């Protein structure tokens, strides 16, 4: 008799199958139950080790002994006519079938019910933790808080809005550096431009006790700035004044206004602020005008005119090579240009960021913007350790800088440090509560945590503020609520302008693939595959992001491992959501994270929130 036949006769193979399936089921149930009782990790490991060690003795017993009506007997002592091995085999087949059904049922229950709930609970726990911290830290409205509203352009031709906006922003920036003041961010303050809103509403929305209003009138080289400080709760005018000068002394005018505000609010000044609040940025009035014009384009993310802004800043630098802020703003501008144009030479843009950021730092090492610009460029190059250091340096220079807090917060969300990322994101919204993109990301995190109401509220606020890309998130929310018709319409309408380089009509095909039937999904996958196959230097960020949503996580990881995109944020942040679980638990995830540079960052500053480092150096993620 052959060995295989003898193993079958003695029911060893059936015993092995029954043992393995039963052991797997025990391990899975233990993994679910033990954490509920706060059991330490070694208990679960001990169960696995004991079951593994027990396999060999169990097989030896199955080989040596046979189950009879009289109990276990050595196989050689059982006569052929007394053997009930065939009956035992039949019963074992039944047991194996039952245990297998239970195991398969548990596997399905874990994958489709427990796992999403665990992921959502983890994200919700993080969200609640950070929200509690933010809520605990949030004080009552301080009497030393202020919003600087956009000054009105009263120039004869009403064509100097960039200048009036620039004046108010410069004063805002000067006040924001005073640690004893709470200053609302630019985006939120400028939201009320031209709205003639009740100041009590403004104060409540921005969390400030005072607002600074004003107007700017320029004619030829002459400038008149009128400003007034108003208390928001009763509309009481605390102070007002007018200042006359010319374009050669705009910094002196800004200094006088900022100084008057700090005096009125009795702000405590530190260090050099006691003598100077507004440093002279440039000796060239023309260079400063060009800087303000470019800044206006940069602030409204007017991608159509980015090249005009770049040309203007380069001209400003030619007029005054020592104009550090022009160098810094040019670096930041080159950072965002690729996100608005698929035709941008990414390598050249990154080189420009490095060049102008470093020249800005050489001229003025205190410019947080320059370090933030370096950080964002390092992100694109997957130089995450340097990125992290650049953002930390920028925050040390200016803890209230909105751009630094927001960019750094996104970076942390992308790298898996969800808790810290949300702290920075909420810090951003504390300073600038109407920053549309920050609201969009807050909505994304709330959606991941299962908070549909919060996600809807913040996503809609971002959309009302003019952020079109948030339609993608509103579509995801509609889908979560079972409204796929609305989801398709939202996604197609909102993403039409973000699919640069993709075939015309892609927005409809992808939207239907995401929220339609299987046939539509197949068409969308084919479209994405064809696009990625023909793409050259970089691909549109939407492609790998929707690959995951279309049920192709492995393909998305492979694409992101070998291709550059014009914006990695949504994809990398997706890794740490319930939807990204298939990617971060994939056998190829460690190879992916090493290839893109994440592993090096984790080795340097610690594992991400959902992962643990093994003795072998790999990361196991939940």
Regions found by a protein language model. Give the residues of each.
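An N-terminal, helix-rich hydrophobic module
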Residues: 1-119
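Acidic-histidine catalytic/liganding microenvironments
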Residues: 10, 178, 320, 364, ...
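Short, hydrophobic secondary-structure boundary micro-motifs
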Residues: 15-16, 184, 273-274, 370, ...
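Acidic, proline/glycine-rich low-complexity intrinsically disordered segments
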Residues: 36, 88-91, 95-96, 100-466, ...
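Short, surface-exposed loop/turn segments at secondary-structure junctions
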Residues: 40-43, 343-344, 574
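Phosphate/oxyanion-binding loops and surfaces in catalytic or ligand/nucleic-acid-binding neighborhoods
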Residues: 53-56, 63-70, 178, 232, ...
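Alpha-helical protein-protein interaction modules
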Residues: 357, 405, 417-622
């Amino acid at each position: 008799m052959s060995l295989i036949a003898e193993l079958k006769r003695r029911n060893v193979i059936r015993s092995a199958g029954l043992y393995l399936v039963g052991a797997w089921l025990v391990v899975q149930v233990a993994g679910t139950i033990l954490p509920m009782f706060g059991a330490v990790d070694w208990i679960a490991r001990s169960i696995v080790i004991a079951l593994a060690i027990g396999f060999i003795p169990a097989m030896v017993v199955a080989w040596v002994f046979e189950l009879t009506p009289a109990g276990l007997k050595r196989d050689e002592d059982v006569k052929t006519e007394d053997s009930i091995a065939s009956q035992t085999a039949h019963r074992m087949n039944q047991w194996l079938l039952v245990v297998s059904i239970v195991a398969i049922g548990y596997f399905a229950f874990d994958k489709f019910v427990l796992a999403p709930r665990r992921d959502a609970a983890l994200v919700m726990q993080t969200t609640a933790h950070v929200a509690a911290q933010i809520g605990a830290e949030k004080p009552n409205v301080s009497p030393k808080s202020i919003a600087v509203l956009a000054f009105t352009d009263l120039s004869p031709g009403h064509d100097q809005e960039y200048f009036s906006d620039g004046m108010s922003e410069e004063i805002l920036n000067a006040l924001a550096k005073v640690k004893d003041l709470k200053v609302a961010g630019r985006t939120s303050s400028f939201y009320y431009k031209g709205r003639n809103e009740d100041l009590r509403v403004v104060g409540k929305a921005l969390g400030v006790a005072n607002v600074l209003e004003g107007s700017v009138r320029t004619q030829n080289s002459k400038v008149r700035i009128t400003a007034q400080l108003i208390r928001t709760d009763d509309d009481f005018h605390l102070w007002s004044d007018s200042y006359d000068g010319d374009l050669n002394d705009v910094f002196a005018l800004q200094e006088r206004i900022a100084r008057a505000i700090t005096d009125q609010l009795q702000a405590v000044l530190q260090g050099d602020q006691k003598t100077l609040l507004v440093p002279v940025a440039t000796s060239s009035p023309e260079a400063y005008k060009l800087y303000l014009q470019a800044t206006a384009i940069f602030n409204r993310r007017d991608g159509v005119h980015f090249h005009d802004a770049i040309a203007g800043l380069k001209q400003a630098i030619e007029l005054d090579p020592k104009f550090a802020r022009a160098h810094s703003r040019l670096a930041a501008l080159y950072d965002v240009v690729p996100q608005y144009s698929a035709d941008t030479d990414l390598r050249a843009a990154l080189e420009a960021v490095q060049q102008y950021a470093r020249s800005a730092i050489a001229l003025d090492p205190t410019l947080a913007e320059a370090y933030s610009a370096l950080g964002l460029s390092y992100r694109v190059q997957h130089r995450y350790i340097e990125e992290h250091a650049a953002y930390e340096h920028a925050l040390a220079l200016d803890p209230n800088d909105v751009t630094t807090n927001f960019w750094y917060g996104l970076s942390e969300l992308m790298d898996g440090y969800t808790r810290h990322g949300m702290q920075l994101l909420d810090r951003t919204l504390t300073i600038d509560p109407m920053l549309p993109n920050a609201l969009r990301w807050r909505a994304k995190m709330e959606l991941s945590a299962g908070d549909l109401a919060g996600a809807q509220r913040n996503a809609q606020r971002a959309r009302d503020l003019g952020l079109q890309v948030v339609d993608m998130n509103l579509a995801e929310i509609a889908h979560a609520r079972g409204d796929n018709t609305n989801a398709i319409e939202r996604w197609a309408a909102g993403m039409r302008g973000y699919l640069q380089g993709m075939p015309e009509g892609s927005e409809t095909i992808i939207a239907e693939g995401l929220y339609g039937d299987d046939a539509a999904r197949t068409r969308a996958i084919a479209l994405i595959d064809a696009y990625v196959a023909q793409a050259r230097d970089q691909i549109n960020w939407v492609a790998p992001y929707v690959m995951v949503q279309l049920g192709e996580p492995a393909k998305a990881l492979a694409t992101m491992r070998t291709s550059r995109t014009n914006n990695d944020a949504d994809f990398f942040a997706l890794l740490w959501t319930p939807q990204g679980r298939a990617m971060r638990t994939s056998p190829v995830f460690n190879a992916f994270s090493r290839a893109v540079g994440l592993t090096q960052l984790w080795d340097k500053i610690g594992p991400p929130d959902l992962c643990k480092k093994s003795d072998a150096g790999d990361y196991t993620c939940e």
